[in-house]
Amino acid sequence: MNTFGRELRITTFGESHGRAIGVVIDGVPAGLPLTEEDIRKELDRRMFCHIHWLNPRCEPEEFEILSGVKDGHTQGTPIAIVIWNKKAISSYYDELWMKPRPGHADLAYYLKYGKFYDHRGGGRASGRTTAAIVAAGAVAKKLLALVGAEVAGHIVELGGVEVKRPYTFEDVKKSWEKPLPVVDDDALAAMLEVLRKNAAEGDSVGGGVEIWAVGVPQGLGEPHFGKIRADLAHAAFSVPAVVALDWGAGRQLAKMRGSEANDPIVVKGGKPGLETNKIGGVLGGITIGEPLYFRVWLKPTPSVRKPQRTVDLAKMEPATLQFKGRYDVSVVPKALVALEAMTAITLADHLLRAGVIRRDRPLKDPVV
Amino acid sequence: MNTFGRELRITTFGESHGRAIGVVIDGVPAGLPLTEEDIRKELDRRMFCHIHWLNPRCEPEEFEILSGVKDGHTQGTPIAIVIWNKKAISSYYDELWMKPRPGHADLAYYLKYGKFYDHRGGGRASGRTTAAIVAAGAVAKKLLALVGAEVAGHIVELGGVEVKRPYTFEDVKKSWEKPLPVVDDDALAAMLEVLRKNAAEGDSVGGGVEIWAVGVPQGLGEPHFGKIRADLAHAAFSVPAVVALDWGAGRQLAKMRGSEANDPIVVKGGKPGLETNKIGGVLGGITIGEPLYFRVWLKPTPSVRKPQRTVDLAKMEPATLQFKGRYDVSVVPKALVALEAMTAITLADHLLRAGVIRRDRPLKDPVV
Amino acid sequence: MNTFGRELRITTFGESHGRAIGVVIDGVPAGLPLTEEDIRKELDRRMFCHIHWLNPRCEPEEFEILSGVKDGHTQGTPIAIVIWNKKAISSYYDELWMKPRPGHADLAYYLKYGKFYDHRGGGRASGRTTAAIVAAGAVAKKLLALVGAEVAGHIVELGGVEVKRPYTFEDVKKSWEKPLPVVDDDALAAMLEVLRKNAAEGDSVGGGVEIWAVGVPQGLGEPHFGKIRADLAHAAFSVPAVVALDWGAGRQLAKMRGSEANDPIVVKGGKPGLETNKIGGVLGGITIGEPLYFRVWLKPTPSVRKPQRTVDLAKMEPATLQFKGRYDVSVVPKALVALEAMTAITLADHLLRAGVIRRDRPLKDPVV
Amino acid sequence: MNTFGRELRITTFGESHGRAIGVVIDGVPAGLPLTEEDIRKELDRRMFCHIHWLNPRCEPEEFEILSGVKDGHTQGTPIAIVIWNKKAISSYYDELWMKPRPGHADLAYYLKYGKFYDHRGGGRASGRTTAAIVAAGAVAKKLLALVGAEVAGHIVELGGVEVKRPYTFEDVKKSWEKPLPVVDDDALAAMLEVLRKNAAEGDSVGGGVEIWAVGVPQGLGEPHFGKIRADLAHAAFSVPAVVALDWGAGRQLAKMRGSEANDPIVVKGGKPGLETNKIGGVLGGITIGEPLYFRVWLKPTPSVRKPQRTVDLAKMEPATLQFKGRYDVSVVPKALVALEAMTAITLADHLLRAGVIRRDRPLKDPVV
């Protein structure tokens, strides 16, 4: 449905051109410092307003925390966040009614929800709804910080341009100072060029991102159906446009022999660890204290300005569609921030499931 | 934990060298024809006993249905299936105690469960435990058959050998008449050669499989967190050794432009459908009546006979490990059957979630 | 946590004196007629504004539907409803800070949430939060109406005054035309007298209500942990101040012999049914097509104006507390509406779980 | 369905006259001492074999732990327990086929499962299936012991005979040395007399039990839908034949005024606590460190030897039924043990949900 997680549970709602979108975040213990600024920071990261030609009318989100926070701390009760929709120009979408856009959710919604769904701006299927996920991710990241864990991602492929040079987690985090989070400046320049070209031609591009989670404690996850890998795959494929995922070295591992693929176990600082980390920090579904990383691949934005073949559902006959509304040349940058958020939410959920963070008492209580 | 699904729910248990493994299947309506033969057929498919050199001591599973079935039909109550473990030679594993095998779950289990876990034969992390999933999959496949849906998979890559020629879903199903389910005879021959070579050298290989689900009705899945893609990704990554997944055309979609990636919508038999199906039958997380397909990539079996570097956890110093027990040269064939099962379970769960199959009354009741 | 239900799922949020309370209702199929008026009607029923001396400053709730509804129908997506909190006078509560009110949740919240919780107006534990449940109940009642089922309750005891004369379900529904829903006019007069007396003396009273669900189809519920009785008990005890529940004839059944307690099975209109219905319409946890009914007992409002003994948590020494804010002389009337709502939500959830209402397609779609 | 709990999860299966009944217990951390003897002790308590005339052919259960336990400790993996059904004489039940027993689940099962369910011995609805719950309760009690909490219950009413004298929790525990756990010897004698009389007359009686949970830490439970009271109500009503529940002083509270009902808050050993405990240890759904207690009322066994009116479902005409099989004169003693188990399971689940017991590492690991 629209709820994700077991002990940290987020419930999202809202359509793109409706009154608002939002999220209820449940399971956060009392006493976590949390301000509107924490939420705003992540919502702003998602917007990439600084690339003006990419988002010509970019504006910061307007949101409110309706519950669960008092005096800069969580109360232990559900945190409801509403992100108000701006006055949108929906007339672009009038032509699309009953003419499902190829590659978009329109056809599926028509079959499942009939004439009742709000198709304007993509409605419930709009990438815009990931803003609610990103707001929840801001809270999850603060929970992770309690145990010294952090999540960050970057773009590794865009419009066919791939990042090829080696990098560290520090490089990943620093890449956010650039126009797009790309560790390799040459690749970044080429990517921006591809984006400009596609914007000019009314087309779109896909790409790939890599998410890292560092400092995640050992012992999270379970052998069969609570595997960290499986829960994060679920999380990642919940983000619109995701079409593939490689865990750790991913598909390359499938081409290796066992003697190559296995990461030797070594003593590190008096504790057992991996010499290499091709497996991405998880063995048998359980974290071992090594960094987690995985790559996620996204298809191009389905909305393009080129004419496309579709069906007029009222007449049930072929039709041509030309989209005239706003669209993102690539969903990759925004999806990256949503994927960071989903990763943080999933891992914070596991911290609570495993009891690493307790909830029978406040996180800190100077009164007691 | 060890339960998967919402309305069709499977709960698995058991360690590789313990008394038994098994599964409880909950949510099946009364009146579904089900016999031991249905279960046995799937358990046999998983074993590939016919490739003698691959499974030198291959024997069919011994199992019992303990509840939920009477006179060849389901009762509507939980179906418990126990698969008895055979007298296993665990002495191979004595040396491994406190010497975690690289690439295996040992190290993670040691960190999470301490000295309490049963490491013999891989314990709870053993690929053997997927037999319980396969038994549950047999039931799920019968539920899918009620609406005319079927699931089948095949091997598309093994030890670096790839299937390259085109094929149909009929080819996929017919490939099960061959020693391994590979649609391309040349590729099959090369794969068998690679397997033999690695068996001789005490090494292992990974590969990839493709799962198809055909006849799945429209309207299953939900826009945000009950996406069919996300639930199937969760399902697939629950199978041991899975490291990557491509939905539909997968990573290739990420390299296309929107105008190429979108599948045109056309009229098919008086209804809207896709001209091509690069997206794998799901739009916005919801089925549209087109076939679903995805590829899953598996790493090589971590157990190999070559010496490997590990740590002696008792002394916390480097150690060398040489595994002498039985192992599968590749997990790919067995995992394929488990992936078919997980796919069938996930989709049957969605049939129940959406109410396509009702549960307030028996499937058929000549009495009424 | 703050989510209830499996296929119809409500998630509530909000503190009494915070910005707003609200609810997200998930799982409703597309095409259910739903207007603000439907919600308002139930919110108004909960307020009993017509008894002026009971609610001196009674005002209708201000609420908004933020998502999931378009043109008077549900979209199939989550329905978020926000009920704005009015400018509340919180100064009454300043004295209560660190002086937990006996009988209220204050002490428990202090222990679990420390200084971080919002104690004003009872915060998250306030009876006010049941308005969100009542809003969700309005939607659930409309789902029940699809299959001809309806839920209604009445007061059977208040301040020690009991309803003793026999009545029908029609009487129960008609009792809502009176100041309080009580089928017996003499009892009603006595109850109003008791309420007035306690209001004057600054004390409060408890009581009991009975909930009926008529027209519920057969075959809902499951034998072990999805029992209708157990799910409704869970639902009922989720409403604040509930301290006891009698299912059907309840505790009286415990005093009978088997030969008296069993309801004879008879042919009714060509189908098997019960001659009497002491068991309250459920056998073995499953509905049989007979009316469901149960009684729920509520303790008196803990907030009273009489001085009470408590502890000053800052000094950890005895203290006396005198509450000066507004309080309800009895929670029974409002809780009754909340219990109707929880009953409707639980039963509508079971209609979806069992597939009686489908969700792979809209409820009605003239387009198709 | 047949799964109960969130972080401690039990899944039961089995029909009374099928091959076996059983339970899978999931979520127990590694390192909990657990032997067959722990399970057997609780299964034996449920049987009351020492009252020979009550259970003429009483025999201890035969069971096996199939997984999750090694060398006297839990492994952290699911614990599957199978309780084998004995060779039962099912011929008693032949006459009952298509003639539903009044008061039993037969009619409901016929409507929901049609001719497919196993009616022999009550099938899935048999009280016998609570043995699986009791086995799981044995494990939950050991988890509670980790934090110093314990659960025990006693009979407070049977066949109309009530316990009236005051007692302590020690009295409750000591009452288990008697033939039936009744704190008052006079009441016990009268109850045994009533049981004998009803056994002789082929009738049955109901009654009431009280469950105590002492030593439960503060801060468990949540304000809205994870209320301890609501979860325990759900737990209690999951036991067959339960028809009413009083939490704490229960219905008596509903007759008091607020000034009487509220328990004064006092300083106890330097901490805040309750002077009296009419509310049963829970405020606002959350534990406060005081003992929990509640009473549960059970209807008489529906199976009696007296002739009863029913319907022949094949002919759809009135019929008379005379049951000739074995039956329990009262379900109260066995249900008491099941209710203790459900209470322990629910509270242990909350210990895990709140993170009081962690699961990222073993409970104790001398190796580390």
Swiss-Prot record, chains A, B, C, D:
Enzyme class: lyase
Record's catalysed reaction(s): 5-O-(1-carboxyvinyl)-3-phosphoshikimate = chorismate + phosphate
Alphabetical UniProt keywords: Amino-acid biosynthesis, Aromatic amino acid biosynthesis, FAD, Flavoprotein, FMN, Lyase, NADP
Coiled-coil intervals, chain numbering: none
Residues where NADP(+) binds: R46
Requisite cofactors: FMNH2
GO biological process: amino acid biosynthetic process; aromatic amino acid family biosynthetic process; chorismate biosynthetic process
EC number: 4.2.3.5
MF-aspect GO terms: chorismate synthase activity; FMN binding
Pathway(s) served: Metabolic intermediate biosynthesis; chorismate biosynthesis; chorismate from D-erythrose 4-phosphate and phosphoenolpyruvate: step 7/7
Gene3D superfamilies assigned: Chorismate synthase AroC (3.60.150.10)
GO cellular component: cytosol
Record's cofactor remark: Reduced FMN (FMNH(2)).
Residues annotated as binding FMN: R124, A125, S126, G284, K299, P300, T301, P302, S303, R326
Xref: InterPro entries: Chorismate_synth, Chorismate_synth_AroC_sf, Chorismate_synthase_CS
Pfam entry (one): Chorismate_synt
Record's function text: This reaction introduces a second double bond into the aromatic ring system.
NCBIfam families assigned to the protein according to its UniProt record, in alphabetical order: aroC, PRK05382.1
HAMAP family, sorted: Chorismate_synth (MF_00300)
Protein name listed in UniProt: Chorismate synthase
Gene coding for it: aroC
